[in-house]
Design a protein with these regions (language model features):
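Conserved FAD-binding catalytic core of PHBH/FMO-like flavoproteins
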Residues: 148-247, 252-255
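FAD/FMN-dependent oxidoreductases across multiple families
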Residues: 226-309, 314-318
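Short acidic/His-enriched helical or mixed secondary-structure segments at domain edges of catalytic enzymes
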Residues: 323-337
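Glycine-rich FAD cofactor-binding loop and adjacent beta-loop-alpha segment at the N-terminus
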Residues: 4-6, 10-71
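Conserved N-terminal helical subregion
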Residues: 52-59, 66-161, 169-177
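Active-site flanking residues adjacent to catalytic metal/cofactor-binding acidic residues
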Residues: 8, 31, 151, 277, ...
Length: 337
C-alpha cells in the first residue's frame, strides 16, 4: 500500500484532511485505534466553529445541524464591566456556529470509512532510501507513504515514536460541560461571565424545534472542587449565574468534566512526520479556538500538498512540510500566549 498521506488518528481533523485530499485525487488512509462505530453517546459535548472553519466543512460537503451565534456578551460578574462582540463588526452574518461534537465527528467518519483502518495503530516508522516513510502497523502490515500526518491528539502516538517532547503547562483548572434549558431573551447570543466562581460560558444548541436549549462550559479552579463533588458545586453556584443572566437555568444532561492544560511542540515537522491540530498544540477552552486552530492547520497542510500536486512537479516533501510549519506555528503560538 502506497498512499501519498498516511494519517494517524481518525478524529475530526484527521478525517477532514483525508476527505479533502481524496476529493482532490490525492490518496490517503486513516489509521484509527478505536472500533468502527458511530458514537452511541448522548449529545453533550459541543464545539464552536468560526465562519472560516464552517466554510471548510461546507466546501467538502459536510452538512450537520448548527446553532448560530450573532453576538457575544462578556462581562465581569463581580463588577459592572462588560463588552459585546457582534457579527456586524467582522462583516459576517454570524460570529460563530455551535455544533455537537458527535455529529461533526460522525459525519466526517462516514465519508472516509473505505479508507480507514480501525482497531489499528502505527507501531513504528522510519525513512527509507527513496525518501519515503516506511510505516509498520500494529497488525504488522506495511505502508509506504510520502507524508505521515499526526492527527492523534495531545498524547500523539506518532510524536512519541519520533521522540518529540512537548512543552506543557497545567492551568490547575477543570472544565465542566453540560446541556441545559434556559429562558434567555436572545437565542442568538452567547454569554461569558468572569467571576470568583469560575468562568461561565453559555451558548445556544442546535435545535430545529426549540431555541431554549444551551450548552454550558464552566472552568473552575481545582481548589474549588477539591472538597465537594462537581454536582454539588454546580447546585451551590449556578443560581449566581442565573441572577447575572436574569434567567432560569435547568441542567438536563449528564455532566462531563476534564482537566485543563496546554502543550505545544517546538517543531511540527521531522522527516516525513507532521503534527497537526491537537497533536501539535492545545489551549484553554476560554478562547473557544482549539478546533478552529486545528482546522486552520488542516487547511494549510492540505493546501500545500494540493498545490504541489496540481503544479505537476517533483514533490519536495521537505519544502511542503516546512511551508506548512512556517504558516502555522507562529500563529498558534500567538494564541497560546
Amino acid at each position: 500500500m502506497n498512499p501519498v498521506v498516511t494519517i494517524s488518528g481518525g478524529g475530526i481533523i484527521g478525517n477532514y484532511i483525508s476527505l479533502r485530499l481524496n476529493q482532490n485525487s490525492i490518496e490517503s488512509v486513516v489509521i484509527e485505534k478505536s472500533k468502527n462505530k458511530i458514537s452511541a453517546n448522548k449529545n453533550i459535548r459541543t464545539v464552536t466553529l468560526n465562519p472560516y472553519s464552517k466554510k471548510l466543512l461546507d466546501d467538502v460537503g459536510i452538512k450537520i445541524p448548527y446553532a448560530k451565534i450573532k453576538k457575544i456578551n462578556v462581562f465581569d460578574g463581580e463588577g459592572t464591566g462588560s463588552i459585546d462582540f457582534s457579527s456586524d463588526e467582522i462583516n459576517e452574518e454570524n460570529l460563530s456556529f455551535v455544533v455537537y461534537f458527535n455529529d461533526l465527528e460522525d459525519a466526517l467518519k462516514r465519508n472516509v470509512l473505505k479508507t480507514t483502518f480501525f482497531e489499528t495503530e502505527i507501531k513504528n516508522f522510519k525513512e527509507n532510501n527513496n525518501d519515503k516513510c516506511e510505516i509498520t502497523l500494529s497488525n504488522d502490515k506495511p505502508i509506504n507513504s510520502i507524508f505521515l500526518a499526526g492527527c492523534d491528539g495531545r498524547n500523539s502516538n506518532v510524536a512519541k515514536l519520533a521522540s518529540l517532547k512537548p512543552v506543557t503547562s497545567n492551568y490547575e483548572q477543570t472544565a465542566i460541560t453540560f446541556t441545559a434549558s434556559a429562558n434567555l431573551k436572545n437565542p442568538y447570543t452567547a454569554y461569558q461571565i468572569f467571576s470568583e466562581r469560575g468562568i461561565f460560558a453559555i451558548m445556544p444548541l442546535p435545535s430545529s424545534t426549540d431555541q431554549s436549549f444551551y450548552t454550558i462550559v464552566w472552568s473552575v479552579d481545582n481548589l474549588q472542587i477539591e472538597e465537594q463533588s462537581i454536582e454539588d458545586f454546580i447546585k451551590e453556584n449556578i443560581s449566581y449565574f442565573e441572577k447575572k443572566l436574569k434567567a432560569n437555568i435547568k441542567v438536563n444532561s449528564d455532566i462531563l468534566s476534564f482537566s485543563l492544560s496546554n502543550h505545544h511542540f517546538e517543531n511540527y515537522v521531522t522527516g516525513s512526520l507532521v503534527l497537526i491540530g491537537d497533536a501539535a498544540h492545545s489551549i484553554h477552552p476560554l478562547a473557544g479556538q482549539g478546533i478552529n486552530l486545528g482546522f486552520a492547520d488542516a487547511d494549510a497542510f492540505c493546501e500545500e500538498i494540493i498545490n504541489a500536486y496540481q503544479a505537476k512537479i517533483n514533490i519536495d516533501k521537505h519544502l511542503v512540510l516546512k511551508r506548512y510549519e512556517i504558516r502555522r506555528k507562529n500563529m498558534n503560538l500567538l494564541m497560546l500566549n
